[in-house]
């Protein structure tokens, strides 16, 4: 039997929510190594760092910022279970075509509105989020720029907060993840972004 989110999606009530500001914590840490022989080697390392943090005794968000042209780790940050503030990223000399941000999501799997804000407002070209099993969701910049990106981002952000209020706050995390996956698929092209994930918003049973 197939369960699809799509037919029931329009029943969600649209409620404009103003998000509260949350104090974010982060610490910059040294990479365990920086002698990568290939981009695959670099990604394998970054993925392990992110997933190991989620599966630790006290799960936290670990972020690895990489340059895929040089195959180097530019910086690593650790946060808490909900946030990882990227202090100092705006001062880094980042290659706008080859900088990718990889991080873990201890709470919620899909790319978040904060992740989308990062890719829209920094030289980062891709943001990848992992869950505890190493499954990913990815958002990347496209060449064509879209007008009214700020308006579209705001629509996306509000819809994400609606889903959190409707589902996540009630413990419906699996449905919430699938709903947010669908919402980003809808809004990403309108923001000039490409979105991919390897977990589906349609659950087969």
PLM region spans:
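Short HxH-centered metal-ligating active-site micro-motif
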Residues: 74-123, 131-132
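Divalent-metal-activated hydrolytic enzyme cores
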Residues: 15-23, 27, 124-205
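Short beta-strand scaffold segments in enzyme catalytic cores
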Residues: 61-68, 127-130
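Short, compositionally biased leader-like segments
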Residues: 14-40, 102
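A short catalytic or substrate-binding loop motif that flags glycine-/basic-rich loops and adjacent residues
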Residues: 55-59
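Short amphipathic beta-strand/extended segments with alternating polar/hydrophobic composition
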Residues: 73-82, 86, 137-144, 151
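Charged, amphipathic alpha-helical segments
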Residues: 34-52, 109-114
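Non-Sec secretion/translocation targeting segments of pathogen effectors
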Residues: 1-19
């Amino acid at each position: 039997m197939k369960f699809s989110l799509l037919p029931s999606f329009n029943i969600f009530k649209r409620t404009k929510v103003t998000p509260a500001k949350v104090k974010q914590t982060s610490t910059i840490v040294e990479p365990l190594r920086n002698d990568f022989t290939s981009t695959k080697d670099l990604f394998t390392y970054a993925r392990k760092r992110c997933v190991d943090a989620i599966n630790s005794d006290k799960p936290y968000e670990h972020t690895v910022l990489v340059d895929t042209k040089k195959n180097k780790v530019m910086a690593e940050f650790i946060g808490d279970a909900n946030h990882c503030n990227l202090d100092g990223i705006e001062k880094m000399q980042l290659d706008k075509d080859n900088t990718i941000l990889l991080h873990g999501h201890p709470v919620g799997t899909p790319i978040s509105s904060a992740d989308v804000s990062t890719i829209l407002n920094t030289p980062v070209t891709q943001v990848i989020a992992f869950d505890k099993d190493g499954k990913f969701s990815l958002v990347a910049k496209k060449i064509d720029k879209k007008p009214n990106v700020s308006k579209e981002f705001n629509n996306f952000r509000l819809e994400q907060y609606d889903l959190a209020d409707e589902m996540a706050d009630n413990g419906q995390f699996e449905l919430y993840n699938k709903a947010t996956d669908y919402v980003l698929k809808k809004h990403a092209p309108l923001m000039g972004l490409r979105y991919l994930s390897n977990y589906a918003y349609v659950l087969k049973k």
